[in-house]
Amino acid sequence: MLRPDLLLHPTPKGLYCPPGDFYLDPVRGAVDRAVISHGHSDHARGGHGKVLAHPHTLSIMAARYGDSFAKQTQAVEYGEAIEINGVTVWLSPAGHILGSSQIVVEHKGLRMVFTGDYKRRWDPTCPQFEPVENTHVFISEATFGL
């Protein structure tokens, strides 16, 4: 099994996946490829080359930043697996806002989950948070963490 730090690790631009050559919710500057957890501005920014996200998140980003917020977009439904440079990525509901997603990254037998913002309490405005089974590493958003 791959060491977790070889699949995802923090950089000044955000959480980076070297084998897939993409960022999760990049925090500084534009990147060539981004996977976005949800449409709030602390996670979703314009100017990236390629953006992969849930269709509702892409719609929120377009409303906020204009239709040209990225050079290319790819909408992915919950549970739909996409391969990026040999790394499997799929989204699971995060229960935070419409389109909010946990980002699941799998490579060489390792499954890591990045939650983005999430909410476990039921909310009628979005699909409920779903735990991702058989997760090896769980990276939780902690807005008010210590």
Predicted features, each with a name:
Residues 36:
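Short beta-strand-to-coil loop within P-loop NTPase ATPase cores
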Residues 2-30, 39-146:
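His/Asp/Glu-rich metal-coordinating catalytic cores
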